[in-house]
Swiss-Prot record:
Role, per record: Binds 23S rRNA and is also seen to make contacts with the A and possibly P site tRNAs.
GO MF terms, alphabetically ordered: rRNA binding; structural constituent of ribosome; tRNA binding
Protein's UniProt name: Large ribosomal subunit protein uL16
Gene3D superfamilies: Ribosomal protein L10e/L16
Gene responsible for this protein: rplP
NCBIfam families per record: rplP_bact
Protein's GO biological process: translation
SUPFAM superfamilies linked to this entry: Ribosomal protein L16p/L10e
Organism: Methylobacterium nodulans (strain LMG 21967 / CNCM I-2342 / ORS 2060)
Higher taxonomy: Bacteria, Pseudomonadati, Pseudomonadota, Alphaproteobacteria, Hyphomicrobiales
């Protein structure tokens, strides 16, 4: 699973996801992509599950690019622990996804396979998505 090699601080504020994505809204690598339509925090496990679903449907042909990276540590307190006494320990990593952000790109497969692969990948994610493709003039 994806996670940063090293961070300056162990814990981070929760934060909010306001507004549309500033960058990463266009296809840069592949011919087809999966674009987020709403703000959400996507965990490293969800990204990996989507990647596996996409790769399996493509039968390991073509190429997959993951355009988001989980760089936010999410903390949790153990179960049945009273409130107070500090913040919990970092449990997993998540990526903040803004609306309009391209999350996955694929290339080297036919459009129908790409559509189905990204549909299966989108089912693993907690965010509404849209299939996009490069416009060739």
């Amino acid at each position: 699973m994806l996670q940063p090699k090293k961070t300056k601080f162990r814990k981070q504020f929760k934060g909010r996801i306001h507004g549309a994505a500033k960058g990463g809204t266009d296809l840069n690598f592949g011919s087809y992509g999966l674009k987020a339509l709403e703000p959400e925090r996507v965990t490293a496990r969800q990204i990996e599950a989507a990647r596996r679903a996409i790769t399996r449907e493509m039968k390991r042909q073509g190429r997959v690019w993951i355009r988001i990276f989980p760089d936010v540590p999410v903390t949790q307190k153990p179960t049945e622990v009273r409130m107070g006494s500090g913040k919990g320990s970092p449990e997993y990593w998540a990526a903040r996804v803004h609306p309009g952000r391209v999350m996955f790109e694929i290339d080297g497969v036919a459009e129908d396979i790409a559509r189905e692969a990204l549909r299966l990948g989108a089912a693993k994610l907690p965010v509404r998505t849209r299939f996009i493709q490069r416009i060739v003039d």
